[in-house]
Amino acid sequence: MADNARAARMAKRIQQIVAVAIEREIKDPRLEYVTITDTRMTGDLHDASVFYTVRGASIDEEPDVPLAAAALESAKGQLRKIVGDQLSVRFTPTLSFVHDTVPEASAHMEKLLAEARAKDEAVRAQAAQAKPAGEANPYKERN
């Protein structure tokens, strides 16, 4: 069993190797908008999960995640060979690609927070103009 520090170092190195390989060595146009965001290794250093995001060609265009996933799946063997050539380890880890949903989740959270702020501001504006129901002093005074 490898220590966690070694697994973390190897994961970081695999992330760099895969990112550079996708950018420079793999000639698949479907991978043009793929970004490698994170890599995690198992404790035995035999499997690496590579997390990726996909962006659209423009800001308004939706990313084609299934197309990018298919491209990564077809390039998996070539990427593993590149990783094996550049890592000096006895066993080259198998690569599995996982779509990273953190950017979409954080964008959704930001949207929800913006809606909550807008509702808070509306309540604050309504409270500033509100007058108490009934008399100004709601408590009965004894004479």
From Swiss-Prot:
It is found in: Cytoplasm. Residues 124-136 have a biased composition (Low complexity). Residues 123-143 are annotated as: Disordered. Keywords: Cytoplasm, Ribosome biogenesis. GO terms for biological process: maturation of SSU-rRNA. Its main location: cytoplasm. PROSITE patterns: RBFA. It comes from the Bacteria. One of several proteins that assist in the late maturation steps of the functional core of the 30S ribosomal subunit. Associates with free 30S ribosomal subunits (but not with 30S subunits that are part of 70S ribosomes or polysomes). Required for efficient processing of 16S rRNA. May interact with the 5'-terminal helix region of 16S rRNA. Belongs to the RbfA family. This is Ribosome-binding factor A. It comes from Corynebacterium urealyticum (strain ATCC 43042 / DSM 7109). The gene is rbfA.
